[in-house]
């Protein structure tokens, strides 16, 4: 059964901004990529490094792992370059009553 996790008010996540939220034992990063709100696990599948500390390309909607440079698609969690080759989990995002929420299961 899914649940919604509150991230922040929508006004606090303008284009290019990033927030992280903890759910159970997982960190989830939420990014406003040109007006599109995207969420995925904040963990590189190559070495468990925090992706939220990497560089985000808002034009391509990607994040670069700060440790070894793997690029991940923010929409799907899919790695686009090596050394990572396993996707990280992505999550639906919605705005309800002005609050950004991530849907988790």
PLM region descriptions:
Residues 13-16:
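Solvent-exposed, conformationally flexible loop/turn segments
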Residues 2-10:
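Short amphipathic
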Residues 18-105:
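Rieske [2Fe-2S] iron-sulfur-binding domain
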